[in-house]
Design a protein with these regions (language model features):
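Extracellular beta-propeller repeat domains
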Residues: 2-434
Length: 434
C-alpha cells in the first residue's frame, strides 16, 4: 500500500448506527448497521481497560459464518495480552453480542497478531494464522477447538521458522483429504514468501512442506493473499509484487498456478503478469481469488486501471477476470476500474464475492462519498459491468477503511469489518441489508 494513506482522519463517534444511504445504480439503496464497535485500550467513557480490553483493529479479517448464523473473525491487536484476538458475534433477541473466544500472546508461543480471517471445518473448529509469534517468532497456523460448552482451546499446528516461510496473512484452506494450504508473505529460499501444505500425521501432529518459494526471477514475490483450489487439485493465488513488469521500481504483481507433478512435487506457472499501462491493474493485495461456475477466476488489484488517483500518479484499482484458454494459458480482462474522483471508491484490498444471480460484491479501502471507503455491487448488463455503491463509510460513528471483504448469510444480508472508526476508533463489524 502507498505510505501515508493507511490512516485517514476519522470523524468523531456520536452514534452506533450509520444509515446514510447511497446507490450509483437505479436499484434501491442498502442499509448498514453496526454490529460491534471494537474498543482499544483507554477508550472513553472509562479509563484504561488495560489487559481486559476488547480486541481492536480487525485488519484483513473476512468474517466467517457458522450454520447457526454466528460470525467469527480476528483482530490484530487488543485482548488481555495485547497481541490480538479471535471473536464471536452472536445474534440474540436484543441484538448482537461480541465475545472474545481467544486472546493471543500469553507466551507468544501460541502466536500473535492475526492479520487474516478464519476457516471453519465441519466439526465447528476454526483455523487461522498469526503473522508473528510461535516457537520461532515467524508466525503460526493454529486451530481453535470448540469444546461444546462455550469455551475454546487453541492448538498450534505449525510454527514457521523463516526458512520455510515467515509471516502468514491469510487463513489456510482445506482439500478433500484434510490437508491445509496457504501462503507466507516472506521467508523461504529467496525471502519473498512461500506457498505451503500442512498434512496431518496422526496423534494431532502436522508436517509442513514448502510447495514453492517465491522470488526466483520473475515468478512473483510477497503473496499476501491466500489460495484457492480447482477440482483437479491445482492451486491459484496472487503475489503483491514481482513478475515480469516493473511498477515504481518493483514488480507489478502476478497471478500464479501451482500444479502437483507427482512424488509430492509441485510446479509453478505465472498465468498473468500485471503491468502499469493505464488499463491493467497492478499490485493485488490481500484478497484471494474466486471461481465462477465456468472456471474463470476473479480478483482485485489495489492500484492500476483506467482512472488516476494520488494526484494523477497511479490508478485507483480494478476488478479483473482470468479466463482459461487452449494450451494451459489464461487471458486477463479488467472488468471494472475504480474512479477515485467519484463516489465509487478506490483501492480495493480484498476479494470479491458472487451472489446466485452472478453479481459481484466487495469493498474499497478508501474513497467514496465520505472518503472512508465503500461497499459495492457490480452487475453485468449488455456485456458491461456497472457499479452500485451499497454503502459509503465514514459517517459519524460509522466504520472507515474496510480492508476485508464481504460474506453472505442465508437471507442475503452482507457482513464485514472495518479496520478503523466506530464508537471507539478501533474498527467495526457491520451488516448491510439489501
Amino acid at each position: 500500500m502507498r505510505s501515508g494513506r493507511l490512516h485517514i482522519a476519522l470523524i468523531a463517534a456520536l452514534a452506533i448506527y450509520a444509515t446514510l444511504l447511497i446507490g450509483t445504480g437505479t436499484s434501491a439503496a442498502a442499509q448498514e448497521m453496526l454490529l460491534h464497535s471494537f474498543r482499544p485500550y483507554g477508550s472513553p467513557p472509562c479509563c484504561f481497560h488495560a489487559r481486559t480490553a476488547d480486541g481492536f483493529d480487525p485488519f484483513y479479517s473476512n468474517l466467517t459464518i457458522d450454520t447457526a448464523g454466528n460470525l467469527y473473525g480476528t483482530t490484530t491487536a487488543g485482548g488481555i495480552f495485547g497481541y490480538g484476538t479471535v471473536f464471536k458475534l452472536t445474534h440474540t433477541a436484543s441484538g448482537w453480542t461480541e465475545a472474545v473466544i481467544y486472546a493471543f500472546g500469553h507466551n507468544l508461543a501460541d502466536g500473535g497478531v492475526p492479520e487474516g480471517g478464519l476457516t471453519l471445518d465441519a466439526a465447528g473448529n476454526l483455523y487461522g494464522t498469526t503473522h508473528g509469534g510461535g516457537a520461532n517468532n515467524s508466525g503460526v497456523v493454529f486451530e481453535l477447538v470448540n469444546n461444546g460448552d462455550g469455551t475454546w482451546a487453541e492448538k498450534v499446528l505449525y510454527s514457521f521458522n523463516n526458512t520455510d516461510g515467515y509471516g502468514p496473512w491469510a487463513a489456510p484452506i482445506f482439500d478433500a483429504a484434510g490437508n491445509l494450504y496457504g501462503t507466507t508473505e516472506s521467508g523461504g529460499a529467496y525471502n519473498y514468501g512461500t506457498a505451503y501444505e500442512l498434512t496431518p500425521t496422526g496423534g494431532g501432529n502436522w508436517s509442513e512442506q514448502v510447495l514453492h518459494s517465491f522470488g526466483n526471477g520473475t515468478d512473483g514475490a510477497t503473496p499476501f493473499a491466500g489460495l484457492v483450489m480447482d477440482a483437479s487439485g491445482n492451486l491459484y493465488g496472487t503475489t503483491w509484487l514481482g513478475g515480469a513488469n516493473l511498477c515504481d521500481g518493483a514488480g507489478c504483481g502476478t497471478v500464479f498456478k501451482l500444479s502437483p507433478t507427482g512424488g509430492g512435487n509441485w510446479s509453478e506457472q505465472v498465468i498473468h503478469n500485471f503491468i502499469n499501462n493505464g488499463v491493467d491493474g497492478n499490485e493485488p493485495w490481500a484478497g484471494s481469488l474466486i471461481f465462477d461456475s465456468s472456471g474463470n477466476l476473479y480478483g482485485t488489484t489495489t492500484l492500476g486501471g483506467t482512472y488516476l488517483c494520488e494526484g494523477g500518479s497511479v490508478g485507483c484499482g480494478t476488478v479483473y477476470e482470468m479466463t482459461p484458454t487452449a494450451g494451459g494459458n489464461w487471458t486477463e480482462q479488467v472488468i471494472y476500474s475504480f474512479n477515485g474522483g467519484g463516489p465509487g471508491g478506490e483501492d480495493p484490498t480484498s476479494a470479491v464475492l458472487f451472489d446466485a444471480a452472478g453479481n459481484l460484491y466487495g469493498t474499497t479501502y478508501f474513497g467514496g462519498l465520505l472518503e472512508g471507503g465503500t461497499a459495492f455491487k457490480l452487475t453485468l448488463r449488455d456485456g458491461r459491468w456497472t457499479e452500485q455503491v451499497l454503502h459509503p463509510f465514514g459517517a459519524s460513528g460509522d466504520g472507515v477503511t474496510p480492508a476485508s471483504g464481504l460474506i453472505f448469510d442465508r437471507a442475503g444480508n452482507l457482513y464485514g469489518t472495518t479496520m478503523e472508526g466506530g464508537l471507539y476508533d478501533g474498527g467495526t463489524a457491520y451488516e448491510i441489508t439489501p
